[in-house]
């Protein structure tokens, strides 16, 4: 779901008193042995949910990478690599055999077994979109001995490895069997993984502070790190995540050395930070985020494809990105449904979005569509920096095209609840909302749940009922040819634009900043990751 990046605008001096007190509380730590090397980080959001199979929230995914490990992982060339296991595929492409590597232990000291991993995959496969699709093709999944997992398919499926090695939410993290058998809609009772860090439950303050210590029993792979693959070598003793919702307080703490790393400073503070010789500013997630508009297909006016097309033609990415980000260094006008910079990227059919030249045609289309003036109810959260601009700019463009628009100011958590409502807009429903996906979550037709055509039968909010889309997604899933997959993906993009399944409004990039006393900070599609980072005094 939403990656809530950025921080609130600068508060007045009278409002900074409480964050300073909160900072003092968060930074208060138990007495540590001399020489304990600690990284203190302010993440993009506070951590409350610590079950990485329960929510797609990116802060929970990031927590997952600290504590847990994966069977497979994706490198910077979009290739799936062995992580906890390597694999073999039968000649008929129906049997995948995974063999666990040596030296794998859970944090409680027990060995990792194939039974643990089977249970973990089964739990993940009930909740994750790619996991559900994979399980539709699975005939059997079993542990054939302590180190061997055998997956048998009903028919060839082209995304077995990509599903198990997916880098972002929901990540198929491995857990002990007793924990993985927790129903997927209930929180797991323990934080026991096999990953490079151990979670310090005793110091966890939900929404305030999370602490991780180096897992001294972890055996890294020999390969160099690349995205979420390769050797996860931990070079510090301890990592602390603390919450500071006030931007200026966090920046002050970074400049004074009270914290070492800030994941997502607001764009207006970047020049100040970049000018500091002790700071390094860099975009770690090179795929960035896709921001998008979503319509409700169940009710007028957007139950009419002609009216949806008029709205699509009225949209323009540049004014949205200018209002959202401001500095073109940190955004990209990009019409690719599967985001620019990925193997499936194409901008075919997106000219009106990327060039902003569709308004005249939008007015003609709307006039010919039978639009009767039904107001477009747009949900506009005002509490999230990366979601404030989109509804305001979109409403202006819709009005220019001839739509009547009702912008309803709210907060993001209300949007999260209200967008699940299938009631009419007059009864608390909605017509349009906006959100952001990290690039890794939308870079292929199976991962990208926004293009689902399942309607009310398991589709994403907005509920387009599009059997043709589902047929094409299944065809993509069955294909193992990159060329064929690329052609199918291009056809899917055409269908997205023809039916206006959703409206891509561009790509933006959220830089991180850290003190130069940190070295070895890695990039990737699911950042930040804290292995490989060292800290000097």
Predicted region positions:
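Periplasmic-binding protein-like
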Residues: 51, 298, 302-342, 389-390, ...
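Long beta-strand-rich cores associated with HINT superfamily self-processing modules
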Residues: 204, 512-537
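Aromatic-rich, solvent-exposed beta-strand/loop patch
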Residues: 92, 107, 152-171, 192-246, ...
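N-terminal lobe/hinge region of extracytoplasmic solute-binding protein
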Residues: 42-92, 119-122, 192
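Ligand/substrate-recognition segments at binding pockets and active sites
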Residues: 206-208, 246-247, 265-267, 331, ...
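Surface-exposed binding/hinge segments that line
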Residues: 34, 99, 133-205
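Extracytoplasmic/peripheral linker and loop segments enriched in polar/acidic and small residues
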Residues: 355, 406-417, 445-516, 537
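Structural transition elements
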Residues: 197, 329-368, 382-389
């Amino acid at each position: 779901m939403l990656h809530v990046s950025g921080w609130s605008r600068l508060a007045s001096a009278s409002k900074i008193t409480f964050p300073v007190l909160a900072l003092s509380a968060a930074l208060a730590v138990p007495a540590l042995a001399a020489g304990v090397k600690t990284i203190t980080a302010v993440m993009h959001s506070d951590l409350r949910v610590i079950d990485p199979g329960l929510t797609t929230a990116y802060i929970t995914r990031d927590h997952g990478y600290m504590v847990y490990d994966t069977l497979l992982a994706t490198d910077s060339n979009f290739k799936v690599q062995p992580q906890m296991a390597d694999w073999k595929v039968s000649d008929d492409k129906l049997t995948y055999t995974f063999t666990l590597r040596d030296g794998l232990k859970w944090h409680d000291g027990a060995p990792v077994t194939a039974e643990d991993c089977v249970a973990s995959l089964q739990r993940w496969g009930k909740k994750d979109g790619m996991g559900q699709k994979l399980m539709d093709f699975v005939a059997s999944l079993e542990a054939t001995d302590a180190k061997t997992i055998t997956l048998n398919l009903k028919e060839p499926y082209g995304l077995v490895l990509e599903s198990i090695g997916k880098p972002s939410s929901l990540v198929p993290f491995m857990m002990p069997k007793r924990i993985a058998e927790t129903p997927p809609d209930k929180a797991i009772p323990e934080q026991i993984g096999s990953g490079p860090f151990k979670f310090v439950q005793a110091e966890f303050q939900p929404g305030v502070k999370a602490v991780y210590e180096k897992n001294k029993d972890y055996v890294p792979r020999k390969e160099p790190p690349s995205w979420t693959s390769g050797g996860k070598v931990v070079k510090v003793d301890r990592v602390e995540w603390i919450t500071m919702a006030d931007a200026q307080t966090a920046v002050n703490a970074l400049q004074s050395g009270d914290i070492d790393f800030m994941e997502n400073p607001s764009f207006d503070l970047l020049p100040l930070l970049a000018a500091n010789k002790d700071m390094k500013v860099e975009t770690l997630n090179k795929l960035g985020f896709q921001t998008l508009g979503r319509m409700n297909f169940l009710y007028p006016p957007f139950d009419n494809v002609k009216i949806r097309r008029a709205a699509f033609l009225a949209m323009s990415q540049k004014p949205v990105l200018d209002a959202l980000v401001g500095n073109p260094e940190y955004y990209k006008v990009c019409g690719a449904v599967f985001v620019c910079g990925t193997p499936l990227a194409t901008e075919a059919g997106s000219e009106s979005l990327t060039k902003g030249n569709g308004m005249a045609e939008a007015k003609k289309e709307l006039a010919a569509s039978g639009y009767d003036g039904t107001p477009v109810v747009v949900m506009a959260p005002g509490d999230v920096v990366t979601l404030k601009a989109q509804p305001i700019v979109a409403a202006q463009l819709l009005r220019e095209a001839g739509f009547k628009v009702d912008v309803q100011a709210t907060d993001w958590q209300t949007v999260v609840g209200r967008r699940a409502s299938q009631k009419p807009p007059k009864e608390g429903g909605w017509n349009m909302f906006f959100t952001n996906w990290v690039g890794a979550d939308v870079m292929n037709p199976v991962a990208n749940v926004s293009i689902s055509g399942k309607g009310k039968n398991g589709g994403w909010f907005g509920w387009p009922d599009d059997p043709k889309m589902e047929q094409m997604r299944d065809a993509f899933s069955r294909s193992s040819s990159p060329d064929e997959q690329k052609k199918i993906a291009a056809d899917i993009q055409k269908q997205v634009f023809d039916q206006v399944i959703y409206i891509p409004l561009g790509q933006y990039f959220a830089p991180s900043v850290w003190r130069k006393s940190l070295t070895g900070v890695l990039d990737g599609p699911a950042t930040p990751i804290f292995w490989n980072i060292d800290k000097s005094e």
